Each structure stands twice: as C-alpha cells, then as structure tokens.
Amino acid sequence: MEKNSFLEMEQESDKPPSTRPQPARPWRVAVIANLKGETPLPFDGPADAGAEFDRKETIEAICNAIASNGHKSFFLPADNNLPYALRDLNPDICFNIAEGLGGDAREAQVPALLEMLRIPYTASCVLANAIALDKTMTKRIWRERGLPIAEFQEFVHGSEPLSSMLHFPLFAKPAREGTGMGVDEKAVINTMRELRQRVGWIIKEYHQPALVEEFLPGREFTIGVLGREDAILYSPRPDLYRNDGFHRFNTLEVDAGKSVTPGIYGHTAKTLTNADAGVPGFICPANVSRQLGDKLHRLAVAAHKAIGALDVSRVDMRMDSFGQPKLIEINTLPGLTPGFSDLCVIANSEGITYRDLILEILYLGASRFKLLEPATFGPFSIDALKPRRVRESVVVRR
C-alpha cells in the first residue's frame, strides 16, 4: 500500500462520526500523546518549550487503566506519522491527550485529523481545543456570556497604547501557552517601562501575542469538570453526577505565597517535586464556605459550556481585591499524571481512583460517538466511592 493511501480509508461511507458501527468488545483504544524527550521542538522555541508534553509513565498509566477494563490499548505518538499509524491500527476510539506540534491551534490538530478520518475520540472537539489554547479568545467569549473575568488587553506588536480600563499592577503572559509557560516573578508589572519590557520579551521569545490583564491578588483555585447533560445515562455510577449531568469535584486551592516565585504559580513552581524547596502549597478540599464552593463549581461548568468543551476540563480562578472569583483560563486537555496532576489529585481526594477517572473519560467520549448504549457496560465497573475530606496540604504538579 502506498504511503498516501491512508486518505482512502473509510471512504465506503459518508456518514458522520456519530454513526460509526458499534465495535465488538474489546475496543482497540489508541492513546495519542506527545512524548516528552522524543517530540521535536522548534529550534527557536523558548527555554520551556515542550513543558506540556507527557512522560512515558503517564502514557503507560492511561494504557493500563484502559486495559484493566478488558480493552486493548496502544500508544501512538502525535507526530507526522500519526495518519499512517492510525491507518494501520484502525482503532475503535482514541484517548487524546496530545498537545500538538506548533501553531496557533496546535491542541486542535489531532482532533481535526481524527474527525477527517472519522475516528471517535475523547474529550473536547476541534473548536473547543483551539479556543481554550487562545486565552484572549476564551476571555472574549466568557465576557460575552457575562462570566466574571479580569480586564484584559492583547498586545500583538508591543507598542499598542495601554487601555484606559487597565491600571497597575498588571499581569502578563503568553496568549497561547499552558503549564505556566512564560510566567515567573516578572509577570507582575508595576510600571509602564516594565510593561513594555515584558510584553516585548513575550512576543520575541514565544512568537505570539502577550495577554495583559489586571492583577488578581486573592486566593487561587482549580476546579475539575467532568460530565455533560446526559452523562447519567452512560455512567455505571450515575450517582457521580448531579441533575445537570456534571460531577462536582472537591475544590483545590493553590497557595504560592511561599513558593519559589512568591504569589505566582508559574512554570518553575509547577515543575518542582515534593522534595524541592519552594514548592507551592496545595489544599484539597479547599477551606471554603459552601456558598463559595457552589459558586466556584457553577462558574467552572459555565466556563466549560461557554466554549463548547466536552466531557472533561480544568478551570482556574483567582479572587479579586473584593474577594470575588474571576475566571483565569480553562484547560480542555488537563494533565493526567497519576498522583501528580491537579485533576488526578482532586479526584483521589474524594475516592475516585485513577482507573475510574480514565474510564469515565473514555466512556463519556465513546457514548458521544454511539459506541455504547445507555447502561450497557459489560465488565466495566466504577469502584465504590467513599468520599473523604483531606485537610492537609497535598503537593501536586500540573
């Protein structure tokens, strides 16, 4: 078969992805990711390029969780050979955690390929992944929906006049990065000179616009989102979900006050291990009132829905000077390193095992593509949940 013949696959039908025939069990599940240390980096990229890529241990953990449910799991690198690997494997569904290989919408690359080839996949679609990566666009959508955000301005050239709506101190970061890339102690800006220097550095170093917003001095929280309106029909543990179809996770608070970058939860702070000095403090569940906890959860779900995110995400918020929470950003491909990534630690704090979390994401995705019927799961079973409240700090990394 010629190398370009993969373009001919699935030409026998013009039906949309949701009408793929239900596969015989077990499923062939391809875990698609960018492997840290093996994914090529741009020659002119920043020092923290590749920070979002996954380690071998994370990929193995996901594959093992899927295989434990009776399915066959395979790792496929998200590189230029992915189309041919998909042709050869012909998976029933893909578990996508790929960050992409550059560009303004790199996190949408793999979903776009899978949709072109009509292969089902987990989590958010092309558009939602593209929007979530572009923090400026995300904020514009949230603002249009009436959701609380900090005042902001995007700098494309660095010489634009500062908006009259913005007042020092300000906070600057790359508009299209994650994992705290481009964020350190110099991200907080107090003068016009600092603003020009920082914005110019971001544009030059990251080859993208700089997002400048009002600095939020209050507490920082991370909220996990899992589910959708009809999740209760497809989950083997319907009691996980509320009437709106979403599970309410414990709230995780990030305390960077004594971190390596005091008050700033940036890239360096996110790469530290438990044994390193300057590790931020993490409290899960956070010590918040029921009223505030409910508000944070409602905002997270609203932010998730506003950009069209699907099944799973992680939403970051910070309190302003008046003690009101404001949305910072959303991650539609949240880290899934067991015992380490925020979402995994949040889930574990209430008795949801790593295996359960991975299988919930898998089955939510499969049900969207009609790969299973409501309440027909064969051997799949969520472990019995025993929520527990953990008051001590838990050190994690995204």
Question: Regions from the language model: what does each represent?
Answer:
Residues 1-121, 126-127, 132-133, 156-162, ...:
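ATP-binding N-terminal substructure of ATP-dependent carboxylate-amine bond-forming enzymes
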Residues 29, 93-95, 222-227, 323-338:
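A short beta-strand motif that forms the metal-chelation/ATP-contact edge
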Residues 24, 192-298, 324-326:
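Phosphate-binding site of ATP-dependent enzymes
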Residues 73, 120-121, 149, 170, ...:
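Hydrophobic beta-strand scaffold residues
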Residues 2-17, 141-143, 287-398:
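ATP-dependent carboxylate activation and anion-phosphoryl transfer catalytic cores
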Residues 2-33, 83, 87-90, 129-222, ...:
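Active-site nucleotide/adenylate-binding loops and adjacent lid/helix of ATP-dependent enzymes
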Residues 38-42, 178-181, 274-276, 337-338:
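Short acidic/His/Gly/Ser-rich catalytic and metal-binding motifs that mark active-site loops
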Residues 45-51, 184-189, 344-346:
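Short glycine-enriched, charge-decorated loop/helix-capping segments at active-site entrances
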